[in-house]
Amino acid sequence: GIPCGESCVWIPCISSAIGCSCKSKVCYRN
């Protein structure tokens, strides 16, 4: 639930390496 400061409209979350995932076009962590 914490924004990772990254969007995932066109590309996947690079921050997924630290546990972030795409929700509503924005990368979130927990």
Curated annotation (Swiss-Prot):
There is a cross-link at G1-N30 (Cyclopeptide (Gly-Asn)). InterPro entries: Cyclotide, Cyclotide_bracelet_CS, Cyclotide_sf. Expressed in leaves, petals, petioles, roots and runners (at protein level). This is a cyclic peptide. GO terms for biological process: defense response; killing of cells of another organism. Disulfide bonds join C4-C20, C8-C22, C13-C27. It holds the Pfam family Cyclotide. Keywords: Cytolysis, Disulfide bond, Hemolysis, Knottin, Plant defense. Probably participates in a plant defense mechanism. Has strong cytotoxic activity against a variety of drug-resistant and drug-sensitive human tumor cell lines, and against primary chronic lymphocytic leukemia and ovarian carcinoma cells. Has weaker cytotoxic activity against normal lymphocytes. Has hemolytic activity. The presence of a 'disulfide through disulfide knot' structurally defines this protein as a knottin. Belongs to the cyclotide family. Bracelet subfamily. This is Cycloviolacin-O2. It comes from Viola odorata.
